[in-house]
């Protein structure tokens, strides 16, 4: 057995194949895909017979995507148990995977407001509070039956039940994370601005789940003022240097940024349009405002359930949010290295399965 073969086995815990030949074939396929990322199944496997064997494997109902995900998640839990970390960050994000106008993909719908075919891939990965990626906790894919409807007003969109909105996947991912992770492991869910909705905050409180979210909504807080104004006008609590990861999309290299931060306890309230009884009327949270020193540049407004008692604890939370860029890097590698958008599979379910498979490779 090669070292590579053994290592890939460690990424799938208790994967259940009744036929050991299928298990052997599975790891050979993983090994081939990892050695030739972005190539077609035919090119990666190296021969006509190997390619046919791979196609037969993907057509076999022996192992489902859900079973594969459970196995991957269990492997991540094993790594988490060995990690030296105060918190494990459960970092969520969504990326769009487009297939252009390839209408021949069975079951594939739309992913944006145009006629372009594609799917949305929502992932949750485990990262230590020191920024070390550990593995995939959860992943789901969705494709729209129709192109996104941009004709609705903001108020129409806001009034829809959360279960009918696409950002429901952020709630779903948090629930799945808590189900999959051992209860004695401290989890901090980290989200970008798409996770900024009251239903998420309220359910996290019900589940006693900690979160750290960059907010975009300038909410009213307990003293009748807007949260952004309150944070900007509050005294500077301290300064710190934040390591910003490189942004390959905008060709920005990694760099250190000196930032000031402000911190304030706030109370936010259930939106008036939300009448659901299960939503909490108000929530007491910690708000943090971080911005570049002396100039207009990078700034973050953060909300968290974590109570802070010192500057050191504030700085730790800011660094934890900075680690959110690990998932953007992960999605970038999945799409640019794995070239999943160029995969020639002709069925949505298979592309979803392959995306999860390539996600494990991308994490490495």
Locations of the language-model features?
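Single, function-defining residue in the core of a domain
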Residues: 1-105, 113-120, 125-364
